[in-house]
């Protein structure tokens, strides 16, 4: 893998479907982090030297009614610590200021903020972190053709390679924690080259994979929830029919109990506009 762009569950902050082994249903925060660490270890294993893990995540704010006091679990910081322990190099993050949708992040924004217009209220939670983790071992050496096909305009470069982004949050009607296609597209273009392979181990509704498709990258998505797998498959098939007549879509179901792959038309495991396959 040349690049990983993903957004893991925000612990149990959001309501995910009842799916076996769903990380978002783990009640103990430390147990959740241990399970998440297993994913990052596999990500580190499959990344090429110099490849990046880009992780979109927000801290977990809990209300007084849940813990007896207002509390923030610093998920972004804990992920950085875990990744450094695995062997990643921590790089500067991007701060994503979510122009809309922020009240959803605290489950009930109006009650979480405390008494209005009085001192000691709780700071509004309207930002997320785009964490940058790099696997050591060298720098990419793409071909001249890849470089030319992957160039970013000066205007976009100056705008994207800043530490604060102002992008509206995506609708939560279809998925409880989506991120905008614009955000995924920027990240794919910033940290990969045309014909590279991009992985999303928490692919949800397939936003990262669509961004990869539209920018000429291969993509692999993994999702545990059958409903979101079907959603991804529909979106990717639509992209394939409208944009990439020569693309190859591989739709597979992974039977974890039997540890083998089962073909199933309605479940998405891998999609790619070119020729590469996950080893």
Per-region residue spans from a language model:
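S-adenosyl-L-methionine
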Residues: 233-274
